[in-house]
From Swiss-Prot:
GO terms under biological process: dopaminergic neuron differentiation
Protein known as: Transmembrane protein 132 homolog
Keyword Transmembrane: yes
Similarity-based family: Belongs to the TMEM132 family.
Annotated function: Regulates neuronal morphology via inhibition of the WAVE regulatory complex (WCR), a complex that controls F-actin cytoskeletal dynamics.
Keyword entries, A-Z: Membrane, Signal, Transmembrane, Transmembrane helix
PANTHER family: DETONATOR, ISOFORM E
Organism: Caenorhabditis elegans
Effect of a null allele: Mutants exhibit striking morphological defects in the dopaminergic PDE neurons.
Tissue expression from the record: Specifically expressed in neurons.
């Protein structure tokens, strides 16, 4: 078997133009170009590593062969979900981090259920996890909020200090898979409590206990709030205490955390009928004086519709000092009240499809658009899409634009620069939010790469064209006179438009490049159809073919190749082109076979937006009657060359001849050559290929057929795979195949044999039934026969004289039967029917029930006795109504309704009664 050699597209300079990659849509993926090597780089760029749709296709062209495939066979799961981190700063009164996950409508239909995992990591590497489940087919699962509580131990002790947490998330199909970190986001954590509210729980002579909360603190469905117990003691020795708490049935205590290392907190729950939570607080021994928080309590309200009816009341009972049998004083029992409100908006979030935008509209003149959605996150961790109720504006329209309805952000080509912080504002009711986009802008001027900026005429290479003739005498004609002429053709030049997308920080002067380096450029040739122009079209023209651009010389002169921005009326780049009358000659013709082309796109590790492209060419014929294309290129005396498959087919002709036509056949048209393997016994046949001018201009060179412009000889290897595996390979393959599988049970041998025998019996039975169908007339003959026997033997009183005539016809009568004699025209049938004494007819009678059966054998098998012939009516095929009309003599007639008709069916003659009665019997025809 032929082993394919995988070749990177940048490894062979001579095939840089023969192997060409294009993408569709062309603005979603780009081939990277290395400016130092003038060859395609080995990687392809896809923004964010996510396509806009699954239909992103890549096509590789090699000679006249092409191979296409999807860039992404499966949509990456992280591309089907948009995740926004809602919480930017965590405060101790609301110790949790919220993340919003939204399904991407355009990509989620290609994936199933999605699980989003989120992870918080502290500075000490402690982690907290959260997850949510998404499914676009369920209305309630198109978006979700992940709320992860932050442990109180992660908050700094000093309220004037802040600590940092990292948030990361990943996407998978199942929620039980291992977590894999994506790029992490940093979040600040602060212990400061702004606008505190103080409620006194106990106020003794030497100790006071207070409850700290935020001002105007209120609860809503599924919300969480933090309450702090503050102790102030000025005694010589601080006494222990017990704090009892009765919570509302709508509330639950999530966490109790000691905030001071000088106190030991023991939490317990009392049994019925008390239902309170006891906090036994014990200070360190001989601790004198204290003024700080000792306990943080995280309380959560249930998500019930009845939760917002009344205020929340918490009952406190503080017992100071050691326990005694005396009841505690009543002045240490306090009830605190908190208001309950409906779930309200806590944050407004902008969820874009892409965080970064490539301003290619400046180059292509086609608007670049990215969708946008606006969500609200409530205090109770509920998400709602409010895009249609929002209004958006851009901070700078020269960088980025946004639709007023917040449906999308876009770039139309009128922008002047990019930015790493292009802000978009969204307004919903009284809430306002912003989002910062990163907009990459083309670095001007662009770059144009050309295989040759000077186009010369090619010696002896004639091409034809129609030339307009001048009209004399000032006579106006409806159609101008034209003349066919041949001239030397001009060279072609391949063109690539290259761009570098960057962001420059005006304040710091830092430069960021999207391709990771300023020398790695994007090949944007496929998107400049509308902006790539020639300043003088009489000198040269630009044509696009299969995603490539080429400049074609027309007349001697100078021109400029320009990429122009119509929005701003400015030239992004220009390159001079010179078309001169200086002749160059063809110096050689190179060719190579391409039997098959395939490629693969592989991701580059740690670079999610970059992919490596590898192309495989098969240059050998591996099967009989396989066809290979011949890629040919012609070189010139000025060290330039052109692939012939890029030229117009009317410019040239190619002829090819095989040295062994029994092994290798050549099939060529005017401009294409293909070879076909015929025999494998000659492994390396030779093909001679010659290049000539077009046939229309062949006679213009010295009045004779022109000589070949270039000739080359090509070896085409034939490697037919007729090898058989060795005995060792067979044994190993058999042992692998015969080994019983865990998933498929083995079948016993006797059951297999019985199954085969049953199938054979079934086949024989079906064959017998089909053959017995040919004797269907026998059933119609025998059934009335036995019925007559039973009826005649059972009734002796009734005497009947019955004659029943039954005609039997063969299913497929041979040509020698008498029925074939009546398959001709009418005159032949009448002539044969008149001969009523044909010796080839034989009568066999069964007199038991007076049934006469007439059988017409072939003439070759009947011995006729001429002396014992008796006149009888001719027996004909009952399938023909035309022939049956001649069975009964003309004198035998029967009358029906006063009209005379010929008797064309079998007839019965019944005796008895006193007369004869002719009846029309039932016609029986056996096919």
């Amino acid at each position: 078997m032929l082993k394919k050699l995988w070749i990177c597209i940048s490894c062979i300079v001579t095939t840089a133009l023969s192997d060409h990659i294009t993408f569709s849509p062309p603005d979603e993926a780009f081939v990277l170009f290395h400016s130092h090597q003038n060859t395609n780089f080995t990687s392809v760029f896809v923004q964010d590593g996510c396509p806009n749709s699954r239909n992103l296709m890549a096509t590789v062209y090699s000679a006249d062969l092409s191979s296409s495939r999807r860039v992404f066979e499966e949509i990456p799961l992280h591309c089907a979900v948009r995740v926004r981190i809602i919480t930017e700063k965590v405060v101790v009164t609301r110790p949790y981090v919220d993340l919003l996950a939204v399904v991407d409508e355009s990509l989620s239909r290609h994936v199933g259920a999605i699980c989003v995992h989120a992870q918080l990591t502290s500075s000490t590497s402690a982690i907290e996890l959260g997850k949510c489940y998404l499914n676009r087919h369920e209305d309630q699962k198109s978006s979700c909020v992940i709320r992860i509580p932050v442990p109180f131990s992660w908050f700094p002790v000093d309220q004037n200090r802040t600590s940092v947490l990292s948030v990361s998330y990943t996407v998978s199909e199942k929620c039980d898979q291992n977590f894999h970190d994506l790029p992490q986001h940093l979040i600040e954590v602060n212990s400061r409590i702004a606008k505190q509210k103080i409620d006194w729980l106990a106020n003794a002579t030497e100790t006071s206990v207070t409850l700290l909360s935020t001002a105007s603190q209120a609860f809503s469905q599924n919300s969480m709030q933090t309450l702090f117990l503050h102790v102030k003691s000025w005694a010589n020795e601080t006494q222990p205490m017990e704090i009892r708490l009765w919570v509302d049935s709508r509330m639950s205590i999530e966490t109790v955390y000691p905030t001071s290392s000088n106190w030991t907190i023991r939490v317990s729950s009392a049994s019925r009928p008390f239902f309170y939570t006891s906090l036994v607080c014990t200070p360190k021994e001989r601790m004198t004086g204290f003024n700080d928080n000792i306990v943080a309590i995280l309380i959560k309200m249930v998500s019930s519709t009845d939760a917002i009816k009344d205020d929340v009341i918490l009952h406190w009972h503080v017992i100071l000092g050691p326990k005694s049998s005396e009841p505690p004083p009543d002045d240490h029992k306090v009830a605190t009240k908190f208001s309950v409100i409906a779930d309200e908006v806590a944050a407004v979030v902008i969820v874009p499809k892409r965080k970064e935008l490539m301003n290619l509209a400046v180059i292509s003149g086609i608007q670049v658009t990215s969708s946008l959605r606006i969500f609200t996150i409530s205090i109770g961790a509920k998400a709602e899409d409010v895009t249609t109720q929002s209004h958006c504006i851009s901070s700078d329209a020269n960088i980025i634009k946004v639709s007023p309805t917040c449906s999308s952000v876009y770039l139309d080509g009128s922008e002047s620069n990019g930015s790493s912080d292009a802000q978009v504002y969204a307004h919903y009711l009284r809430y306002t939010t912003t989002y910062s986009f990163r907009v990459w802008f083309p670095k001007l001027p662009l770059k144009i790469w050309m295989s040759s900026s000077t186009l010369s005429t090619i010696k002896n290479w004639k091409v034809g064209f129609w030339r307009d003739l001048p009209l004399g005498g000032g006579v106006k004609r409806s159609r101008a006179a034209r003349q066919f002429a041949c001239v030397n053709r001009f060279q072609h030049s391949h063109v690539k438009v290259l761009a570098s997308l960057w962001i420059e920080d005006i304040k710091t002067g830092d430069q960021l490049y999207l391709s990771s380096h300023k020398s790695i450029l994007f090949d944007v040739t496929n998107i400049v159809h509308n902006t790539l122009q020639i300043s003088n079209r009489t000198v040269a023209n630009v044509k696009f073919y299969e995603g490539r651009a080429k400049v074609i010389g027309e007349n001697v002169g100078l021109a400029k190749l320009i990429v122009r921005n119509a929005k701003k009326s400015m030239d992004l780049v220009s390159e001079n082109i010179s078309v001169q009358n200086k002749e160059v000659s063809t110096t050689g013709l190179s060719a190579r076979p391409i039997c098959d082309t395939s490629f693969r796109i592989l991701p580059i590790l740690f670079s999610p937006a970059f992919f490596k492209v590898e192309i495989a060419h098969s240059k050998s014929l591996t099967k009989l009657y396989q066809q290979c294309s011949i890629f040919a290129s012609v070189s010139y005396s000025d060290a330039t060359w052109e692939p012939l498959n890029d030229l117009d087919s009317s410019y040239f002709e190619m002829s090819a001849h095989s040295d062994n036509e029994r092994a290798l056949a050549v099939s060529h048209h005017a401009s294409k050559v293909h070879v076909i393997a015929i025999d494998e016994n000659w492994p390396l046949p030779v093909v001679e290929i010659s290049l000539q001018s077009s046939a229309q201009c062949a006679s213009t060179i010295n009045g004779a057929s022109p000589a070949a412009l270039a000739v080359t000889v090509l070896n085409v290897p034939i490697k037919i795979n007729n090898s058989f595996p060795s005995a060792t390979d067979l044994d190993s393959s058999f042992s692998t195949t015969i080994a019983p599988s865990d998933s498929l049970p083995s079948i016993p041998f006797h059951i297999f044999v019985l199954t085969i025998i049953g199938l054979i019996i079934l086949f024989l039975f079906i064959s017998f039934v089909r053959r017995s169908a040919a004797f269907k007339g026998y059933e119609q003959l025998v059934v009335p026969f036995f019925s007559r026997l039973s009826s005649s033997s059972g009734s002796n009183s009734r005497q009947e004289e019955t004659n029943e005539w039954v005609w039997l016809s063969q299913p497929q009568p041979p040509s020698s039967t008498i029925s074939s004699g009546y398959s001709g025209n009418k005159s032949t049938a009448e002539r044969q029917s008149s001969n009523g004494d044909d010796p080839s007819r034989t009568s066999i009678s069964y007199h038991g029930s007076e049934i006469s059966v007439f059988i017409a054998p072939s003439q070759g098998n009947v011995v006729v006795n001429q002396s014992s012939r008796h006149p009888r009516y001719t027996l004909v095929d009952s399938n023909s109504d035309h022939n049956l009309a001649r069975i009964v003599p003309k004198e035998d007639r029967w009358t029906t309704g006063g009209h005379e008709q010929f008797h064309t069916w079998t007839w019965k003659q019944r005796g008895g009664g006193g007369g004869r009665m002719m009846e029309a019997p039932i016609r029986e025809s056996i096919a």
